[in-house]
């Protein structure tokens, strides 16, 4: 009978340790791994958010540059039209002056 009691006590103690938490030396590395994994995920999330923000800013800057380029081109076209009009007015004035001079001489 004592043998059975000893056997049951031994069995109970040995099976109880399997259901309990792991020993302290095994928990520390897993805890450290969890901390590292969580921190690493946060860093990766921040990097991807930063990259997305930079892409958005680069697109907006590109659009601004295109708008400024369009304004410059439009300004050049307007300047070109104005210059052409001035040149035509000057040419017509010179032609009329030459005709008047020829008429007065002839």
From Swiss-Prot:
Keywords: Amidation, Secreted, Signal. GO terms for cellular component: extracellular space; perikaryon; terminal bouton. One of its GO terms (molecular function) is neuropeptide hormone activity. Residues 1-19 form the signal peptide. GO terms for biological process: adenylate cyclase-activating G protein-coupled receptor signaling pathway; cellular response to calcium ion; growth hormone secretion; positive regulation of G protein-coupled receptor signaling pathway; positive regulation of growth hormone secretion; positive regulation of insulin secretion; positive regulation of lactation; regulation of protein localization. The modification Leucine amide is found at residue 74. Residues 20-30, 77-106 form a propeptide. InterPro entries: Glucagon_GIP_secretin_VIP, VIP/GHRH-like. It is found in: Secreted. GRF is released by the hypothalamus and acts on the adenohypophyse to stimulate the secretion of growth hormone. Belongs to the glucagon family. This is Somatoliberin. It comes from Bos taurus.
């Amino acid at each position: 009978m004592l043998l059975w009691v000893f056997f049951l006590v031994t069995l109970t103690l040995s099976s109880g340790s399997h259901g309990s938490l792991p020993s302290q030396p095994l928990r520390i590395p897993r805890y450290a791994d969890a901390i590292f994994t969580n921190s690493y995920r946060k860093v990766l999330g921040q990097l991807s958010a930063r990259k997305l923000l930079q892409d958005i800013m680069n697109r907006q800057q590109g659009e601004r540059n295109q708008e400024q380029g369009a304004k410059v081109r439009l300004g050049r076209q307007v300047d070109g039209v104005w210059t052409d009009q001035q040149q035509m007015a000057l040419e017509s004035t010179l032609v009329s002056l030459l005709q008047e001079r020829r008429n007065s001489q002839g």
